[in-house]
Amino acid sequence: MTQEGKRILVMAGGTGGHVFPALAVAKYLAQQGWQVRWLGTADRMEARLVPQYGFDIDFIDIKGVRGNGLVRKLAAPFKVIRSILQAKAVIAEFKPDVVLGMGGFASGPGGVAARLAGIPLVLHEQNAIPGMTNKLLSRIATQVLCAFKNTFTTVKSKVVGNPIRRELIALGAEPKPLADDALKVLVVGGSLGAKIFNDLMPSVVAALSKQQSITVWHQVGKDNLAGVKAAYQQQGQEGGVNIAEFIDDMEAAYRWADVVLCRAGALTVSELAAVGLPSILVPYPHAVDDHQTRNGQVLVEAGAAFLLPQAILDVDKLVGKLQLLANDRTELARMGQRARDVAVLDATEQVAAVCISLAEKG
């Protein structure tokens, strides 16, 4: 059956961990002839990013309520009702065949509005521990999808992995020669950087370079460039370090790297698996329900990563792990292969297939 003219409303926003997997599915369905519309909030990253990919976006007024003050909590029910009505209006005008929720503030009201309208609702949870919105919506969803095993314990769900860019999947399939020169360390702390990496890495490189040849590509985050550059200079290490506020071409960065030091966001973990890179994971300690630790366990249990809680992280521990990897390049390569072995490479197609199936039934 042709997919020409089928319509999907995609709900995802707030962070790249929600938006980029949703974009992968949206692009795939658009190539199959689907009309794609997006539901988000005007003050989050989807407002800027989604139109760049050629998709129309509608906005509703909704913010998170978890952990907010009393007045905001009292007003929350009225704001939620208003946002559901706004989402219902979008659905009534667009008439989607299926609605896909992938996290973010807009998913809650949009998901409720979809079910009230009798439209199939598909949820996808990227993290190993479900967010509050998906946890609530899972009770009314037509189909619940997740990236990791045992994410949902109260509803039936299907494990499909996290949708990621095709370029990264292709990169992981390329043969990677055994590293025998300077250890190439990619340091990524997200778009805002990670203060702990910015604080420790200049001293780590200084200590390690006395024993090993090492080069570093360090994403320091917005407004941190001058300070981190000065710290490397004070350690006499600026020569072997490439410092950037933000790395636009992650495909090039992954291709360059031997090992990655990073947080354990769901999308990061899935990308590391897809490209087949070993990693040192430092979960963000303030993540809701400590979900990053659970995300990272997938790679740790596979023997593809080390996990160091930020509370115990120091220069000596980082030097020790990097020294270990630098001294055993065969094990470094094995860790990369183990990462690739646990990758789910067809997540985009699996999510899209569920949406297509439900649209055809409707």
UniProtKB/Swiss-Prot annotation:
Signal peptide stretch: none
Alphabetical GO biological process terms: carbohydrate metabolic process; cell division; cell wall organization; lipid glycosylation; peptidoglycan biosynthetic process; regulation of cell shape
Localization terms from the record: Cell inner membrane
One MF term in the entry's GO annotations: UDP-N-acetyl-D-glucosamine:N-acetylmuramoyl-L-alanyl-D-glutamyl-meso-2,6-diaminopimelyl-D-alanyl-D-alanine-diphosphoundecaprenol 4-beta-N-acetylglucosaminlytransferase activity
Known catalytic reactions: di-trans,octa-cis-undecaprenyl diphospho-N-acetyl-alpha-D-muramoyl-L-alanyl-D-glutamyl-meso-2,6-diaminopimeloyl-D-alanyl-D-alanine + UDP-N-acetyl-alpha-D-glucosamine = di-trans,octa-cis-undecaprenyl diphospho-[N-acetyl-alpha-D-glucosaminyl-(1->4)]-N-acetyl-alpha-D-muramoyl-L-alanyl-D-glutamyl-meso-2,6-diaminopimeloyl-D-alanyl-D-alanine + UDP + H(+)
Major localization listed first in the record, in broad terms: membrane
Keyword line: Cell cycle, Cell division, Cell inner membrane, Cell membrane, Cell shape, Cell wall biogenesis/degradation, Glycosyltransferase, Membrane, Peptidoglycan synthesis, Transferase
This protein's pathway: Cell wall biogenesis; peptidoglycan biosynthesis
Coiled-coil ranges from the UniProt annotation: none
Topology term for the membrane: Peripheral membrane protein
Enzyme category, top tier: transferase
CDD domains named in the record: GT28_MurG (cd03785)
Residues where UDP-N-acetyl-alpha-D-glucosamine binds: T15, G16, G17, N127, R165, S191, I247, A266, L267, T268, V269, S270, E271, Q292
Entry's Gene Ontology cellular component terms: plasma membrane
One Pfam short name: Glyco_transf_28
EC number(s) reported in the record: 2.4.1.227
Record Gene3D superfamilies: Glycogen Phosphorylase B
Domain of life: Bacteria
Role summary: Cell wall formation. Catalyzes the transfer of a GlcNAc subunit on undecaprenyl-pyrophosphoryl-MurNAc-pentapeptide (lipid intermediate I) to form undecaprenyl-pyrophosphoryl-MurNAc-(pentapeptide)GlcNAc (lipid intermediate II).
NCBIfam families: murG (TIGR01133)
Family of the protein in this entry: Belongs to the glycosyltransferase 28 family. MurG subfamily.
HAMAP family per UniProt: MurG
Protein name: UDP-N-acetylglucosamine--N-acetylmuramyl-(pentapeptide) pyrophosphoryl-undecaprenol N-acetylglucosamine transferase
Name of the coding gene: murG
